[in-house]
């Protein structure tokens, strides 16, 4: 995998019209484009189709978490939109993950989100998950891969432990990535792009450091050069 192919640019914009100049600028420099909740809530499957027309696979980051039947139907609809990857919450349980895989079909890789990168140990304890984040992440990763998930989403702090737990097959996608010197924002468990890849990340998700850069394409090239 070329360094640039490891970068997923997040289209964190309220509309595709707002996202399009950025998406067109970075698409030649990255491997994937991510449509998240904000953009999907505004424009639905049309946002996925528009992003896909730029020639990169689309990562639809909806973090589905509901009863298995509902998630299966939602995954089927996501597949019809043209998404190549789709996220669900591993905490929804093995049956929900299995349902997502059934609904998505063979053309879409289902990724299971473990613990959000905005949560630290204190935040996890407050919702009843005592102990270090790594323990919860590894437990959820094993559950999801056992249920058929094709990949795991985890922070750079846990990616090495997840790789050791699930083996070489699943795709490991890592948000919470910030170039050296960049602001953490609302992320609690972060690392630089190079640190994440060295730890075992296959794909790094980069949002604000690209979106807010004066020259997003140049920023993407700089990240790729450091991998």
Curated annotation (Swiss-Prot):
According to UniProt, this protein's pathway is:
Pyrimidine metabolism; UMP biosynthesis via de novo pathway; UMP from orotate: step 2/2
Write out the GO MF terms: orotidine-5'-phosphate decarboxylase activity
Q: Which InterPro entries match?
A: Aldolase_TIM, OMPdecase, OMPdecase_AS, OMPdecase_bac, OMPdeCOase_dom, RibuloseP-bd_barrel
Q: Name one GO biological process term.
A: 'de novo' UMP biosynthetic process
Q: What is its EC number?
A: 4.1.1.23
The catalytic site is made up of 63 (proton donor)
Q: Which GO terms describe its cellular component?
A: cytosol
- Indicate what this protein is called per its UniProt record: Orotidine 5'-phosphate decarboxylase
Superkingdom, natural source: Bacteria
Q: Does the keyword Lyase apply?
A: yes
Q: How would you summarize the oligomeric state and partners of this protein?
A: Homodimer.
Q: Which family does the similarity line name? A: Belongs to the OMP decarboxylase family. Type 1 subfamily.
Species of origin: Anaeromyxobacter sp. (strain K)
Q: Give the protein's function.
A: Catalyzes the decarboxylation of orotidine 5'-monophosphate (OMP) to uridine 5'-monophosphate (UMP).
PANTHER family in the cross-refs: OROTIDINE 5'-PHOSPHATE DECARBOXYLASE
Q: Which residues bind substrate?
A: 12, 34, 61-70, 117, 178, 187, 207-208
Enumerate the UniProt keywords alphabetically.
Decarboxylase, Lyase, Pyrimidine biosynthesis
Q: Per the record, what are the reactions this protein catalyses?
A: orotidine 5'-phosphate + H(+) = UMP + CO2
């Amino acid at each position: 995998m070329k360094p640039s192919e490891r970068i997923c640019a997040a289209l964190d914009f309220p509309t595709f019209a707002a996202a399009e100049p950025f998406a067109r600028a970075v698409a030649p420099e990255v491997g994937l484009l991510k449509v998240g909740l904000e953009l999907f809530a505004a424009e639905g499957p049309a946002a996925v189709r528009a992003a896909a027309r730029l020639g990169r696979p689309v990562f639809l980051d909806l973090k589905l978490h509901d009863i298995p039947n509902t998630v299966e139907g939602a995954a089927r609809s996501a597949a019809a939109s043209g998404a190549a990857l789709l996220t669900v919450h591993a905490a929804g349980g093995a049956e929900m993950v299995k349902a997502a895989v059934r609904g998505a079909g063979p053309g879409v890789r289902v990724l299971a989100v473990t613990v959000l990168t905005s949560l630290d140990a204190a935040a996890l304890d407050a919702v009843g998950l005592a102990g270090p984040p790594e323990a919860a992440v590894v437990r959820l990763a094993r559950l999801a891969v056992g249920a058929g998930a094709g990949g795991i989403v985890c922070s750079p702090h846990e990616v090495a432990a997840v790789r050791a737990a699930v083996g070489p097959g699943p795709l490991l996608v890592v948000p919470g990535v910030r170039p050296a010197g960049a602001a953490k924002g609302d992320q609690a468990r972060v690392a630089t792009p190079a640190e994440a890849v060295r730890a075992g990340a296959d794909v790094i998700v980069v949002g604000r450091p690209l979106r807010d850069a004066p020259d997003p394409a140049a920023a993407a090239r700089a990240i790729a050069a450091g991998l």
